[in-house]
């Protein structure tokens, strides 16, 4: 149940009846403060201006047409023309019952879309590092949310599996008589990459051989394709270990690397020329875009084919967008790529739209994100100034969580401790990132992320176990509880119920904006409201069975909401801590 949508519809109808245009925006929002009710309609200001009347006057007229019987206990006008809506306790009680009767907690399903989500995208022959963390876990939270809502989601792991570096790597492996790349660990490959690059830069004969190998690889030579495939396989096998550790839903089947689009590139260049969008300029093929200006104020030239016939990332990204619409039949495409790539993507998509490869009705959305910084406010590095490998970061998270859990549970069996430490450690790293607005940079801080206070994974995991402990202490007859009515008579019961019933609204925002921090903030709020409810509204020692059962049902919906919400973020819950 989306109460915000229900109220928006009711207020909109009343506004139209009061003389507002049919496309008026009621602007129904969750109220920021309890004294302003549960929801507030703020749309009177903009509409009253168009109608040439005072907002408060319009609000008064709207109220005469607004029928919220059975939904609101009170509706009042505040300030210059805000409409405050206070929900009826009986309505809240009924909605709590309905949510508990549904595995989906009453969350409705929107019109099903095919949504392609581009995320993670590590490079072949390199180990994943912290720079891949944000794209991987934010993208996965978006995927989980969209799938829960019922959409058909296609995960697209756009790995860097093509380019001149492969000629260089194959040449170096051959030189070392290590053609059987399948037996090598990725750590070896990283060393090979550095050595290969050094030789490529210093030894012209080696560089020439590497360039020849690229040509052979691109022409489809069986031997070179086989060597290339081995490099890709080693990398993806290693990456899958990291994905599994991170509790991320990506698999080998989701790999759609740059190489997938190679066969399309010559045709795209020819088509852009035929459409008059691409022209020859100084030997290269270029698209000049009026939408982007260079320093001189002239249209910016975007190269799609170099003098030597080579293609660029832009060409691949044009092909990629075209493929996602024409072959995957996407209704919407989301890209979780860092903010530094924004102009590059905008240029590629401008060309895509001009060429008619993807219609305007299909959104191409860059869900960009900021950087992960160290405590010094600079990009997060090792003490030696190197790139932090993702596997090393997760090892440290596990070790720190292990110490933390052992300290609080000295008698816990080793296997149980390991399982709990894994949930807490990995959860802490993910939640610390997901709880920040993705568009901003954030400071990576072990102490903060592993704290049991504040908006952290350990606190949220503990909050969940605390709710479960109520049920462990109570001798509950599940059937009797299922048929028991929900009674809302206390303010704290009403506040908790109203917030729990905003789960669907929260999911809708995350699905629309790709902002998992909104879900984190919501769950943290729910945990805090439950804490206040638990302290002020006795559950097991309630005055009678009816109140006890009703409060148990509120606790039950709290537990289910926390678990389901954390699951959409890819954060594991635990039964005990």
Swiss-Prot record:
Segments forming a coiled coil: none
Domain of life per record: Bacteria
Main location: cytoplasm
Gene3D superfamilies reported in the protein's UniProt record: Arginyl tRNA synthetase N-terminal domain (3.30.1360.70), HUPs (3.40.50.620), Isoleucyl-tRNA Synthetase, Domain 1 (1.10.730.10)
Record's catalysed reaction(s): tRNA(Arg) + L-arginine + ATP = L-arginyl-tRNA(Arg) + AMP + diphosphate
Motif ('HIGH' region): 122-132
GO biological processes: arginyl-tRNA aminoacylation
EC number: 6.1.1.19
Similarity section: Belongs to the class-I aminoacyl-tRNA synthetase family.
Subunit organization: Monomer.
Protein known as: Arginine--tRNA ligase
Lineage of the species this protein comes from: Bacteria, Pseudomonadati, Pseudomonadota, Gammaproteobacteria, Enterobacterales
Gene encoding the protein: argS
